[in-house]
């Protein structure tokens, strides 16, 4: 896919050249061969998400305000009880722990992970801690969706940020309420993977496409013999594989390296309505159409009006009122004819000829699609 940011009217030339260059470079790879492992994955071989509630200690006065976050004090009390330290209930509610923060710990348990293997963990503040920088995560069990503990996390946080505050002023760089611990969790339990079950394995395409499914099945049949693979639908391919573990692993390794010609993706335009960015692939074409687009602006200004009583009046008060002025300005839109465009560079050039802002282009593309002149699927995210 080719990416481009829509153009501001005052700087069309350099961006148009860059877009054409990207289109030519990426468009040259439409027939480039790819491996099966890059378009499909073996069903059942996947990572599993782990989560856990933990505490970060050792903060420099930037932890939770425990009077507002009672679960921080409760979590610390439960942890101390495991160490044989019991606090009176009357004291728990009075704890002022500025160097402790309640956090949510997440990790991805990779496929085939074995006990003792280290995995990375992400740590995010759950309360009102100002910063987790310099903190240490105490032992936190990480559980899967079934409620079983699969890993234990602990270690010093790496927070890619900095901040300082004094005299009512505050400066902050990056995010201080989240961090990461490389290799901070140790796997304690194996997740069974059904790789050796049955007489066949199932490949799942990353994107549903009948053409790609057919090509994957044909590539496997050419290498391992007819009827070794069959496409079940636009995403699933059933492959007959050896039953012995070593032979099956070797079979999968060789199968994933098989080359296949990449099919041309279906034409698609993706619009991000929040950022104003637009992404389209090289299959997008544009039919001949005419567009008129005018800008409409509404400006509201408020002017304070002071009303004072007469000099000799009694009981009068000075009143400040506001007078609002509303102006609506609509700029005329010139009708522009867009020619038929069969290449991405031509589509980019035609859209840039409108001189529209990114937000305007969002509406223009939707209108072109509604008129039947945009030969692509339009997706708004």
Curated annotation (Swiss-Prot):
Main location, first listed in the record: periplasm
Show which residues constitute the signal peptide.
Answer: 1-33
Subcellular localization is given as: Periplasm; Bacterial flagellum basal body
Query: Under the GO molecular function aspect, what terms does this record hold?
Result: structural molecule activity
Please provide, in alphabetical order, the Gene Ontology terms of the cellular component aspect for this entry: bacterial-type flagellum basal body, distal rod, P ring; outer membrane-bounded periplasmic space
Task: Look up the record and give one Gene Ontology term from the biological process aspect.
Answer: bacterial-type flagellum-dependent cell motility
Keywords, ordered alphabetically: Bacterial flagellum, Periplasm, Signal
Keyword ATP-binding attributed: no
Q: Name one Pfam family in it.
A: FlgI
- What the protein does? Assembles around the rod to form the L-ring and probably protects the motor/basal body from shearing forces during rotation.
**Which family does the record claim for this protein?**
Belongs to the FlgI family.
Quaternary structure note: The basal body constitutes a major portion of the flagellar organelle and consists of four rings (L,P,S, and M) mounted on a central rod.
Q: What is the name attached to this protein's record?
A: Flagellar P-ring protein
Q: What's the source species for this entry?
A: Albidiferax ferrireducens (strain ATCC BAA-621 / DSM 15236 / T118) (Rhodoferax ferrireducens)
Q: What is the lineage of its organism?
A: Bacteria, Pseudomonadati, Pseudomonadota, Betaproteobacteria, Burkholderiales
Give the gene symbol: flgI
